[in-house]
Amino acid sequence: MENYTPHQARYFAEQINLKRSESTIEGLASAMSGVKVDLNPHQVDAALFALKSTLSNGALLADEVGLGKTVEAGLVLAQYWSERRRHILLIVPASLRMQWRAELSEKFFIDSIIMESATYNKRKKEEIPNPFDCTEKVVICSYNFAARRTAEIHSIPWDLVILDEAHKLRNVYKSSNVTGHKLKDALEKVNKKLLLTATPLQNNLMELYGLTSFIDDHVFGDAKTFREMYVTVANTDLRNKYLRKRLQNFCKRTLRSQVTEYVRYTNRIALLQEYEPSPDEENLYNGISDYLQNEHLYALPESQRNLITMVLRKLLASSSFAISGTLDSLIARLECLLKGYEKDLDLSDFDLFSEYTEENDENSPTNNHNDPRAERKKDYIGIQKELALLQRYANLAKGITSNAKGDNLLTALQQGFGKIAELGGQKKAVIFTESKRTQDYLFNLLSHNGYEGKIVFLNGVNNDSISKEIYSRWKKRHANDGTISGSRTADIKAAIVEEFKNEASILIGTEAASEGINLQFCSIIVNYDLPWNPQRIEQRIGRCHRYGQKNDVVVINFLNNKNAADKRVYELLDQKFKLFSGVFGSSDEVLGSVETGVDFEKRIAAIYQKCKTQEEIQHEFDELQKELAAQINTKIVAARQSILENFDEEVSIRLSDCQKNTISSLDTFSQWMYYFFLIHGAERVEPLDMWRFKYKSPDGTTKTYNLKWKEAETAGDIFLRKEAPFFKAWLAEAINAPLSPVNILFDTSKSKRKISFFDSHPHMKGLLSIDKMSYDGLGEEEHLVFTVTTKDKTKLDEDLINRLLEIPATITGPCQKESAAFSKQRSKNLYKQQTQIKKANKQYYLNECEKLDAYSEDLKNGLERDIKELRKEISVKKKAFKASTNLPLKEMLDLKDEINKLEKKRKEMQRDLYDKQDAIDDENDRLQEEIRKKLEGKIVTEHIMTISFEVV
């Protein structure tokens, strides 16, 4: 067995725990080493950009769709979390809350809490004064919920706030953007805001002003000045060049075409399965569609009429089984109304109903039930007629035992499996539906047609016997390997996905239950129900068509040939949004043109609701296509390319360097983890290879740990992270253990790794001192300062010192005494490190001063603009006066009085101008003084160890 010393354990513990500058790859390595993400250089580059300076109030990450902005933000979040800055808020669209929660848990091992009405009220009952005040978990909430709880959000000293789909805020400068204004005010004190959007600039340059001012009000002046300086200008090339310079420290955008060297994109291949419904199915569809178009309906609460109508249309298109159960709920409500009281509708079959309700609340905040007393006053005869009609449709639905679309699914799967076999993929397909009843129908249909025992499904509950059995086997299989999280929801999802990967051929998933899962081993996606929201379709396909997918992906869709509206919807999604074919899927311009997918869904629903003839349907969809075309502004696309995007060659060089440095830093960090585990674990640890060990814990169980997450998953090992409780305890033990100055003998013959340098310098002797310098000012950072001298004057750099301390060693006696020259060199090295910290701070200071000076100039230009406008007005009045010789004397005198008053006002404004300019300069000085105080900081030095050494 190899011997090591407590001094070596302390050294590696210090390196692992060291707070490096977070704007460097070395500083991010600690966070990167503990995540289950196959990192790409553009993601690391973006995270470093966002972390680069605590002086900056935040950043806008605007990579194209599909490049992993979630991972970029997750790295920033993980860095904050590892530094115990844990007041973190995520504001996202309601539809993405669960996906973010799953990503944080599965990839970054960070727990989160979704703050919604139920959670908020529960925490209030637990006597938590501010339910948002949480440091043991990341808080996730929707835009709408955040806007309703601004007082609570404002009162918390957030360390980091991340806003996904941040284009919702690009019009925050407009008074009509109520939600944006509320959030901006609520987050005004936050030091770091991270905005994520693939479409930062869609319609006009004022959107860039809105997003930048949301991050930092001290970048540009007011909206009017920005418009005058950057929007209404003749020389757009000069404008773009200047804007690019102003925004380069706040906005970062990478294109998919720039990362193809690192991210392998496979193709999407579309298969369309057309079908014709049976006469009964068509009668059911047309009958319920006509019913929903009635002006007054008693079964639908008026306050949610539009929302519920849209949901019913989706269930109607899904399957007769989906609408059948929902008709029963409508009937039950009408029967209760006849008895004089109200009953809630049960729409739980629609997977996303609660999410849709949350989104709907944004535009309908007072979404209350109808007053039962008002219900009783309604026309009982009308209610009875409606009840009879729905009972007739319910009976018709129950009489339909098979669906044409379902029968065609069998054909489509055969074609899909045939195609994927040609492409070299596995015989696996994921089928998406929005209805749980449709999911049950498909399970039974496929089980009776050759797929029995090969199907698994996800629906958010998974209480069926098959899922329970899969879950039970999974728990036994992973009983001792650290895979089980303890959360049934997360664990059963992991169990189902593992079963699908290793055993099953088909996964039937409802929408919400399938969020956050990665299925890159599957190459067929079946949209059994086709959502109207293009962003949701992109998310669905992205479950399989993502980084790590080795094969082209087949996307199967269904089209009812007898439904004119369905045809036009498919045409839009396929030809306009280009969702189903090609390498990249939908473009940012097109996805961005719909603003939010939910709004687009409502637009589609409105067409279904009001159009009764084919001519009306064609006209409305033609108008919608014109609207979408108008929203893609080619001039704005060109401006975005000029202002926000970098030359491919520049990006290529930067990403190449980032890739090399990331690999190097992660390998170094993993080696520190390896040697610390080996040294501190001593006889309890058996190394298997460079990244794997067997460890016998105090309770007698033996576990295999792996420092590489991918290899850990393949081998069934436990992924070792420095955040593991026992590992954190070991680090604390090593750092707190007292160390005496000693002499250490390093024996290269006992090392399993060949270190050529020390082999070529036998019997090297020397003295080594290690100090830790901590700086607390512009953020916190720590540096290890090495002072070393050797008897033969050989120079050892930090890398060689690191290699030296990896060699097995024993303590042989006391340390040799420090010479005066050595002490002097040690002081010199500490001073040099202090100078380097100040040098880095100087650059931050200059950047911030440049930003504030430009901001001040904007404000001054705004002041002068008002005087210029007044001068123009005076000039117009003077011309009118000269031309007024034919007017009566009184009117001429009145006009002259107006001119005199305006001249007087101009003189007053001119005098005020100097005072206001002085005030702006004073404010600039005050802000710069605040920065200077931050930069001064506090520097503390701690001596770690001094050893004399000999290498044999």
Question: What residue ranges belong to the model's regions?
Answer:
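Walker A/P-loop
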Residues: 56-76
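P-loop NTPase motor cores of the ASCE clade
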Residues: 335, 633, 637, 650-862, ...
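Inter-lobe coupling linker of SF2 helicases/translocases
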Residues: 129, 135, 139-158, 173-191, ...
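Amphipathic alpha-helical coiled-coil segments
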Residues: 901-921
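C-terminal accessory region of SF2 helicases/translocases
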Residues: 2-9, 551-710, 714, 720-723, ...
